[in-house]
Amino acid sequence: MSKRNTPQRRHNILALLSEQGEVSVDALAKRFATSEVTIRKDLAALETNGLLLRRYGGAVPVP
């Protein structure tokens, strides 16, 4: 996905998190065919906005 698709990817990450309860960086990178670094940046941005909590290797929903 290109930079213009970043908001859509982040939206999809939140949808997956809602469905699964937990997501891993590795699985997200494979699913979206992007690097783990990109996924970590996405998770960091979403955490900054209070939308999830990052954990080692992934993320969980905000309680």
Segments from the language model and where they lie:
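HTH-adjacent hinge/linker in prokaryotic transcriptional regulators
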Residues: 2-37, 41-63
